[in-house]
Curated annotation (Swiss-Prot):
Its EC number is 3.5.1.18. It is an enzyme of class 3 (hydrolase). It comes from Shewanella woodyi (strain ATCC 51908 / MS32). It comes from the Bacteria. It catalyses: N-succinyl-(2S,6S)-2,6-diaminopimelate + H2O = (2S,6S)-2,6-diaminopimelate + succinate. Its cofactor is Zn(2+); Co(2+). The gene is dapE. InterPro entries: ArgE/DapE_CS, Bact_exopeptidase_dim_dom, DapE_proteobac, Peptidase_M20, Peptidase_M20_dimer, Peptidase_M20A. SUPFAM superfamilies: Bacterial exopeptidase dimerisation domain, Zn-dependent exopeptidases. This is Succinyl-diaminopimelate desuccinylase. The lineage of its organism: Bacteria, Pseudomonadati, Pseudomonadota, Gammaproteobacteria, Alteromonadales.
Length: 376
């Protein structure tokens, strides 16, 4: 097995790029891509480093998308090896970001190098959209780069996001869509008072409980063949002063929807407001739109991905829309077809994150075959 993808993955992991830091990861990638004829454009927005690299001027435009930032390491004492000192143990590469997603970044670069060497006059264009703000607040990362590209009418045809999509073996699952995400921050207003004199107070917890129960039990939709039913989850709830003899003056509730294409954010918001109003609550509420649902159906990108995985691994893949959000939510609204394909996700965001070394080579081969099927 070639060592080039492993070596690059180790070089990337050794840089402690805890979000929103990049720590030179994009420079390392840019140097490799520039040698293949890519034009490199650094886009820095506040604390976030982004890279747009493109080879070719014509369409169609295939774009690898990913992030160089990683989540914090957590308790260092629980790591078997230093998280930013990547080592191979029993066939697995250990280190923060090994699976999410520096292994994918290395595979993208090496696959592109191999493809360009074999097909220097390929059709269309290849691009890389890389950010250091995917694990953080996602304000100055991919969304800002997309805004820049849209402003100059630079359109992505197909995008492959290197998020760790696989579950048990490489390529068993690809993400061909994601649910939308909507967060609500709700404050139920009451009147603070002494618990011995409830008639002089107004307990917001008691008032809110029936409404929250109705929201939790509500069936928002039935989903469809591509998406599970919309889910509502209360993520945080806080009320009271910490004293046992004080009725609180307010109750704060944070909740989140992961919603299908059967509803819109506007529909969900109105249904929530109707329930709160029906219970006669005095409340304040604000909303955070985290991303719209998207779906990539049958077509060149999904077909190429299926065929590549079958050719490289010998197994069929299962396109799904489950799981959390990714930066694909910012790319899809431009009209691009978006697929996520990456390593097994069993250890992502955990201590002792790792990826199977042989999977890095298989992933590289998958990426290269996808390029060949789309641009040759």
């Amino acid at each position: 097995m070639s060592q080039e993808v492993l070596t690059l993955a180790q070089d990337l992991i050794s840089r402690p790029s805890v979000t929103p830091l990049d720590e030179g990861c994009q420079t390392l990638m840019a140097e490799r891509l520039a040698a293949q004829g890519f034009e490199i454009e650094s886009m820095v927005f506040e604390d976030t480093t982004n890279m747009w690299a493109r080879r070719g001027k014509e369409g169609p435009l295939f774009c690898f998308a990913g992030h160089t930032d990683v989540v914090p390491v957590g308790d260092l004492n629980r790591w078997h090896t230093p998280p930013f000192d990547p080592v191979v143990i029993d066939g697995y590469l250990h280190g923060r970001g090994a699976a999410d997603m520096k292994g994918s970044l290395a595979a993208m670069v090496v696959a592109t190098e191999r493809f360009v060497e074999k097909h220097p006059d390929h059709n269309g264009s290849i691009a890389f959209l890389i950010t250091s703000d995917e694990e953080g607040p996602f304000i100055n990362g991919t969304t800002r780069v997309i805004d820049t590209l849209e402003a100059r009418n630079e359109k992505i045809t197909w995008s492959l996001v290197g998020e760790p999509s696989s579950t048990h073996k490489l390529g068993d699952i690809v993400k061909n869509g994601r649910r939308g995400s909507l967060t609500g921050n709700l404050t139920i207003n009451g009147i603070q008072g002494h618990v011995a004199y409830p008639h002089l107070a107004d307990n917001p917890i008691h008032k809110a409980a029936p409404a929250l129960d109705e929201l939790a039990r509500m069936k928002w939709d039935n989903g469809n063949e591509f998406f599970p039913p919309t889910s509502f989850q209360i993520a945080n709830i806080n009320g009271g002063t910490g004293a046992s003899n004080v009725i609180p003056g307010a109750l704060e509730v944070m909740f989140n929807f992961r919603y299908s294409t059967e509803v819109t954010a506007e529909i969900l918001i109105q249904r929530v407001l109707n329930i709160l109003d029906a219970h006669g609550l005095d409340y304040d509420i604000s909303w955070i739109f985290n991303g719209l649902p998207f779906l990539t159906g049958d077509g060149p990108l999904l077909d190429a991905t299926r065929e590549a995985i079958k050719q490289v691994t010998g197994s069929d893949t299962d396109p799904q829309t489950s799981g959390g959000t990714s930066d694909g939510r910012f790319i899809a609204p431009t009209g691009a077809h978006v697929i996520e394909l990456g390593p097994v996700n069993a250890t992502i965001h955990k201590v002792n994150e790792c990826v199977k070394v042989s999977d890095l080579e298989l992933l590289t081969q998958c990426y290269e075959v996808i390029l060949e099927k789309l641009l040759c």
